[in-house]
């Protein structure tokens, strides 16, 4: 449709620098951006003279439409953001509905027992044109959501975590539940907070 669109399918519309690793071996620095709606990572090799660049609305030079390629969708590839140091990789997940699939996850904390990730998930709602003057036209809208996933490090799958304390029993090992309760109570952690979840997982990785 030709209605205006609010929001973006991208985590960040601008291309930023990230180092790409294959089986922990560096393949070099690339410009990348993550289309979280399609769950696709677009990459461009800096200095590639065949790539056409255009000026965006902010005056930045960015690769023209169709000039980027997709990062290979294999689990051995990890992309590390040069600015934040945060890793992005393809991981097998069970989502909120229990369905098994692969998705790009951002690593928040990692250690000997658990890895904590978040997924930047994007929903799209089509706008509606006003049929009369009593009703307002609503634009198309992209909305971003943050979902947490926890992987036991002896398993391949990262499990969806709702953020509710009672649901920790579905993502943690039985023997760690008591320790988790003690950490949450002792440090007054909120399990829906990214910062507090990082503290919890780092504590559980000390055991």
Regions found by a protein language model. Give the residues of each.
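Long, compositionally biased interface segments
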Residues: 159-207
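Short, hydrophobic/aromatic-rich segments at coil-to-beta transitions
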Residues: 12-19, 114
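Generic hydrophobic/packing signal
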Residues: 5-6, 17, 25, 29, ...
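Aromatic-patch recognition
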Residues: 21-163
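Sec-dependent signal peptide cleavage junction
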Residues: 1-10
């Amino acid at each position: 449709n030709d209605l205006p669109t609010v929001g973006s399918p991208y985590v960040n519309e601008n291309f930023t620098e990230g180092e790409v690793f294959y089986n922990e071996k560096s393949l070099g620095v690339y410009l990348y951006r993550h289309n979280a709606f399609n769950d696709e990572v677009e990459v461009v090799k800096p200095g590639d003279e065949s790539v056409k660049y255009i000026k965006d609305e902010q005056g930045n030079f960015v690769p023209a439409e169709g000039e980027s390629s997709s990062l290979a969708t294999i689990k051995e590839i990890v992309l590390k953001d040069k600015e934040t140091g945060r890793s992005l990789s393809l991981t097998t997940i069970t989502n909120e509905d229990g369905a098994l699939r692969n998705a790009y996850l951002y690593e928040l904390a990692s250690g000997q027992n658990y890895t904590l990730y978040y997924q930047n998930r994007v929903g799209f709602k089509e706008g509606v044109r006003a049929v009369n003057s009593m009703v307002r036209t609503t634009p198309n809208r992209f909305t971003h959501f943050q979902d947490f996933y926890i992987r036991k490090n002896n398993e391949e799958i990262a499990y969806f975590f709702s953020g509710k304390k009672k649901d920790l029993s579905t993502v943690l090992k039985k023997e760690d539940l008591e320790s988790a309760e003690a950490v949450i109570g002792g440090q007054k952690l909120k399990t829906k907070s990214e910062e507090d979840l990082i503290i919890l997982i780092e504590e559980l990785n000390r055991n």
